[in-house]
Amino acid sequence: FVSTAQGLGAEVNVQVAGGDVDEQISQIEYFIQKEMDVIVIIPIDGDALYDVVKEAKDKGIKVVCYDRMIANVDADLYITIDNEMVGTLMGEALVEACPDGGNIFAINGSPTDKNVEEVELGFRKALKGSKLKIVYTGYCDNWLAEMAATHVNKGLEVTDDIVGVMCGNDD
């Protein structure tokens, strides 16, 4: 993305908030102050970003939401993938890997991320008719890998008789 934009003559300023929504708000405020033409955002928490993104839009800055939508801000562009299909593929992989069935954990991303609902829907559809049973479900605020590990440990307190874990985390 960056190299393509630069190749087209755009000046690119990349900021990484590291899962910290307050930091992401500060970064967007910085871009507004710098009067950027376009802000591309992978929202950590769309609800929390609403005011600052609306401010950017009100000042004529184009807003592109990448992977996660920010509700009611009328983004100029929304780029995403088929999240339900992602969940379906994860579910199918577990069904194939565990044909005899058994207990599994479902460790999902952020509870404030609409994509998580879609991934879960696809995942649960893929499990229908299989012998797999979700015995523990957890959600990781801001998609933090550390929370995923915590949820696996909590799940193991419920039962250590598992055959698999679905973890909707990029780490």
PLM regions and their residue ranges:
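A residue-level marker of the well-folded mature domains of exported/periplasmic proteins
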Residues: 1-171
